[in-house]
């Protein structure tokens, strides 16, 4: 049996893949475009420094950005059967988010899946697991964020679940939540508080622009942030200094 036929046979194994019924409001392009202007760092600050994925998940090259609503997949260790299945139902512009447990000893994503995703019009992919074919993936116009890379391929037939609440990069999310990503990482905005977080993020951007202007105008760090004089204490009488 050659490798190609072996792979096809593995995919034909009856897999225990479960898809949950999901219903969420699809945001219009105009609504999503507002989030394209929000950096992940600002969104995270607006959520009390929460809902930003672990730094182990990063883009495969600089300049990649994500903005779209999540479709979720949970896979078993090193198995990508459920991802293959998800690619048959996901819609244009959506972000595929994969709960892979952070395992990086087997790649669950590679060149072929990326090519299919581009054909679908996927908005991007976030994987808490490993990828491979990195050289080819970097040349593609598909935003891809992952927690590792390896030449070792995936297993098949291990099953998985689609369109369920998952944890990716230590952040809980569900289908329909807004996913944004950039060079700093990936942030998750729960759908039900998106308007509140968007407003807060826009206000923070304005605030930071004002701070930048003050710095460029020559104002000192002390004056800008109203930092009090730091008391000098003897080494034998050290105490906690409150700024």
Could you describe each region identified by the protein language model?
Residues 2-76, 207-221, 226-230:
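Intrinsically disordered, low-complexity regions enriched in acidic/Ser/Thr/Pro/Gln residues
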Residues 55-58, 75, 97-99, 125-129, ...:
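General beta-strand structural signal in soluble alpha/beta enzymes
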Residues 57-60, 80-87:
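Short, charged beta->alpha transition segments
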Residues 86-129:
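Extracellular/luminal Protease-associated
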Residues 132-149:
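Histidine/lysine/aspartate-rich catalytic loop segments that bind and position anionic ligands
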Residues 147-224:
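Acidic, glycine-rich flexible loop/linker segments
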Residues 241-243:
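Conserved small/polar residues in nucleotide/adenosyl-binding loops
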């Amino acid at each position: 049996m050659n490798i190609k036929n072996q792979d096809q046979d593995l995919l034909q194994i009856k897999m225990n893949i479960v898809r949950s019924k999901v219903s969420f409001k699809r945001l219009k392009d105009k609504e999503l475009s507002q989030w394209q202007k929000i950096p992940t760092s600002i969104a995270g600050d607006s959520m009390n420094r929460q809902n930003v994925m672990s730094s182990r998940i990063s883009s495969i090259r600089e300049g990649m950005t994500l903005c779209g609503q999540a479709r979720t997949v949970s896979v078993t260790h090193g198995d990508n059967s459920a991802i293959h299945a998800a690619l048959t139902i996901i819609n244009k512009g959506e972000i595929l988010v994969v709960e892979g447990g952070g395992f990086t000893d087997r790649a669950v994503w590679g060149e072929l899946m990326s090519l299919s995703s581009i054909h679908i019009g996927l908005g991007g992919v976030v994987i808490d697991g490993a990828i491979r074919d990195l050289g080819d993936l970097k040349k593609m116009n598909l935003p891809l964020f992952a927690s590792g890379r390896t030449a070792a391929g995936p297993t098949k037939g291990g099953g998985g679940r689609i369109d369920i609440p998952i944890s990716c990069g230590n952040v809980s999310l569900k289908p329909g939540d807004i996913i944004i990503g950039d060079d700093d990482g990936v942030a998750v905005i729960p759908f039900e508080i998106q308007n509140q977080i968007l407003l807060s993020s826009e206000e923070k951007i304005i605030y930071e622009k004002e701070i930048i202007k003050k710095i460029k105008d020559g104002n000192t760090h002390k004056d800008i942030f109203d930092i009090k004089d730091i008391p000098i204490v003897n080494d034998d009488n050290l105490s906690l200094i409150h700024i």
